[in-house]
UniProtKB/Swiss-Prot annotation:
<keyword id="KW-0479">Metal-binding</keyword>
<feature type="glycosylation site" description="N-linked (GlcNAc...) asparagine">
    <location>
        <position position="202"/>
    </location>
</feature>
<feature type="binding site">
    <location>
        <position position="277"/>
    </location>
    <ligand>
        <name>Ca(2+)</name>
    </ligand>
</feature>
<feature type="glycosylation site" description="N-linked (GlcNAc...) asparagine">
    <location>
        <position position="49"/>
    </location>
</feature>
<keyword id="KW-0106">Calcium</keyword>
<feature type="glycosylation site" description="N-linked (GlcNAc...) asparagine">
    <location>
        <position position="394"/>
    </location>
</feature>
<dbReference type="GO" id="GO:0000272">
    <property type="term" value="P:polysaccharide catabolic process"/>
</dbReference>
<feature type="binding site">
    <location>
        <position position="275"/>
    </location>
    <ligand>
        <name>Ca(2+)</name>
    </ligand>
</feature>
<protein>
    <recommendedName>
        <fullName>Probable pectate lyase C</fullName>
        <ecNumber>4.2.2.2</ecNumber>
    </recommendedName>
</protein>
<dbReference type="InterPro" id="IPR011050">
    <property type="entry name" value="Pectin_lyase_fold/virulence"/>
</dbReference>
<feature type="binding site">
    <location>
        <position position="286"/>
    </location>
    <ligand>
        <name>Ca(2+)</name>
    </ligand>
</feature>
<keyword id="KW-0325">Glycoprotein</keyword>
<feature type="active site">
    <location>
        <position position="205"/>
    </location>
</feature>
<dbReference type="InterPro" id="IPR018247">
    <property type="entry name" value="EF_Hand_1_Ca_BS"/>
</dbReference>
<dbReference type="GO" id="GO:0046872">
    <property type="term" value="F:metal ion binding"/>
</dbReference>
<keyword id="KW-0456">Lyase</keyword>
<dbReference type="GO" id="GO:0030570">
    <property type="term" value="F:pectate lyase activity"/>
</dbReference>
Length: 420
């Protein structure tokens, strides 16, 4: 098989970086080597304001920053947030119930080396018309981990254009708003990894894939008539691994799991399950390896040599993991709690929505109490004592022997580093 030039470039770039420090323990896939703001400065978000000093918008407006939080709650935004290059956003550092950003979407276009963890991005019907809840049109090396994205007005989470080396893992992509109601486009030759995510309550594009893609251990629930996994539907060439996923029909589902493939979409498929009967039990079956079962794609006999997961779950294991841990799950908010309950109804609950009020909006979050941080370097005093740093000296951006900054070492310790 002749590989496309963009694919060869992408794989060469990844192979040169495999020995580099990964973004955080547990980072995988094409975007695993994003560096974020490791070589820059710390920015502590101290309020829930839309803009101004101490706000999240201000925090991501400049390059080379690691963003941590001394506040928890809902940040209501009027305009889209545009993220700069080499920014790390560590939502797990927020006290209380964490951070939800509500009211409009985010652009990560050209936000090279972004690292984003444990944050909720909820656009809503008041957001910019024709825009995604989270969109990437260009940029290289980004990883999104345990992110909950919902209520996009165009797509919910899309990656297009010249973007390359992107990973979305352990995340929830939910409830694109009607009448469009799309999970998202994943269409770049630069390489996108989708691992252990939940797509739920999107009429179509769960996701729609073109180009170079690894789709492993995801759960897709209650897609609508537009389609579940849409295989390109394009004259362009696509090369994908589709491994160990579970597709579960819900009340809105009226078409099969895979649609709109053609001879230009080359897919290596293995151990994907489909439960079409909406009977309140998880009792799906393995899809036979045939073009007809996979929407007309050209079935490949060998797996593409893309950066893969360290451990491939069975589809049943993927469902167990995703329902327990996907999204900003350090503390699950009311929205994600409802979504997981829908999945666990095994086909009897769920629906497409046009207004987030159906879900109770973003809900309320316990803001918690910020820990004492005498030197203001982002690491609480008690944690500094355990790390061996000085609570009275701004030293969180110094490098630990692991290669991460002390700030990253502390933040990484707050959440699990493995999934098996």
């Amino acid at each position: 098989m002749k590989l496309s030039a963009p694919l060869l470039v992408s794989l060469a770039a990844f192979s040169q970086a495999v020995t580099a420090l990964v973004a955080f323990p547990g980072a995988e896939g094409f975007g695993a080597n994003a560096i974020g703001g490791r070589n820059g400065q710390v920015y502590v978000v101290t309020n829930l304001n839309d803009s101004g000093t101490g706000s999240l918008r201000d925090a991501v407006s400049a390059t080379d920053r690691i963003v941590v939080f001394a506040v928890g709650g809902v940040i209501k935004i009027s305009d889209r947030i545009v993220v700069s290059k080499r920014v790390t956003i560590l939502g797990q550092t927020a006290p209380g119930d964490g951070i939800t950003v509500y009211g409009n979407g985010w652009s990560f276009s050209n936000a090279d080396d972004a690292i984003v963890r444990y944050i909720r991005i909820r656009m809503g019907k008041g957001g910019s018309s024709g825009k995604d809840a989270l969109g990437i049109a260009e940029g290289n090396r980004m990883i999104f981990d345990h992110v909950s994205v919902s209520w996009g007005r165009d797509e919910t989470f899309s990656i297009n254009g010249d973007a390359s080396n992107i990973t979305v893992q352990n995340s929830i992509i939910a409830q694109g708003l009607e009448t469009h109601s799309c999970g998202g486009l994943m269409q770049t030759d630069g390489g996108v990894s989708l691992f252990r995510n939940l797509y739920i309550d999107n009429k179509t594009r769960n996701p729609k894939v073109k180009g170079v893609n690894e789709f492993t251990n995801n759960v897709v629930y209650n897609w609508g008539g537009g389609g579940g996994y849409i295989a390109g539907d394009s004259a362009g060439q696509s090369y994908a691994n589709i491994i160990g996923n579970y597709f579960i029909s819900g009340p809105s589902t009226s078409v099969t799991a895979f649609t709109r493939g053609n001879a230009n979409f080359h897919g290596y498929v293995q151990n994907n399950y489909y439960d079409p009967d909406k009977d309140g039990q998880l009792d799906g079956f393995e899809l036979g390896v045939s073009s007809s079962n996979y929407g007309g794609v050209a079935i490949m006999s060998s797996k593409y040599n893309y950066p893969a997961v360290a451990y491939t779950m069975s589809p049943a294991e993927a469902v167990t993991y995703v329902t327990k841990y996907a999204g900003a799950s350090k503390v699950r908010d009311s929205v994600d709690t409802q979504l997981i309950a829908q999945v666990q109804s095994w086909g009897t609950e769920g629906g497409l929505i046009s207004d987030e009020a159906t879900m109770g909006g973003p809900g309320t979050l316990n803001g918690g109490t910020p820990a004492k941080d005498t030197d203001g370097d982002g690491i609480p005093d008690e944690a500094e004592k355990q790390l061996g740093t000085d609570p009275n000296t701004n030293d969180s951006m110094k490098l630990h022997s692991s290669g991460y900054t002390y700030l990253e070492v502390w933040a990484n310790s707050l959440v699990p580093s493995t999934y098996h």
